[in-house]
């Protein structure tokens, strides 16, 4: 068994997604049994990144979780040795997400909640490929 598990969260400045993930990690009673866990938060927005790192560290203080959080704005710096990489990135997330529901509805198709099904999901995927593929190439390296 590996001594350390490294998780990289790209787009960690997202308060909605990151906060939930941080809670899940620090509150999980099984994770301490798998060894050391390092979580690297990555975001291009330095202020949001700093806020989420502070939040993660406070959660560790309160819960006594053994997880070690760190942060960087440079994903290439964060990726080497990663066992898991999670992406929480999107172009124009909130502004365009509403459009993903409205456009299909105008043609009689009620879109389900989320980015995972129907024509709205296709819109979401197509506009984000340009953002996601360079990240995937960095992960491959």
Task: Annotate each predicted stretch with a short phrase.
Residues 2-101, 111-141:
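Metallocofactor- and cofactor-centric catalytic cores in central/energy metabolism, strongly enriched
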């Amino acid at each position: 068994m590996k001594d350390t598990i490294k998780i990289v969260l790209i787009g960690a400045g997202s308060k909605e997604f990151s906060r939930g993930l941080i809670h899940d990690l620090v509150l999980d009673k099984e994770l301490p049994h798998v060894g050391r866990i390092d979580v690297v938060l990555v975001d291009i927005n330095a202020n949001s990144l700093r806020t989420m790192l502070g939040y993660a560290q406070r959660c560790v203080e309160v819960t006594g979780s053994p997880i070690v959080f760190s942060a960087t704005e440079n994903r290439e710096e964060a990726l080497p040795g990663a066992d898991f990489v999670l992406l929480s990135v999107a172009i124009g997330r909130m502004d365009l997400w509403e459009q993903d529901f409205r456009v299909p509805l105008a043609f009689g198709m009620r879109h389900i909640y989320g980015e995972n099904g129907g024509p709205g999901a296709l819109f979401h995927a197509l506009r984000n490929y340009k953002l996601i593929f360079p990240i995937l190439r960095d992960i491959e390296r």
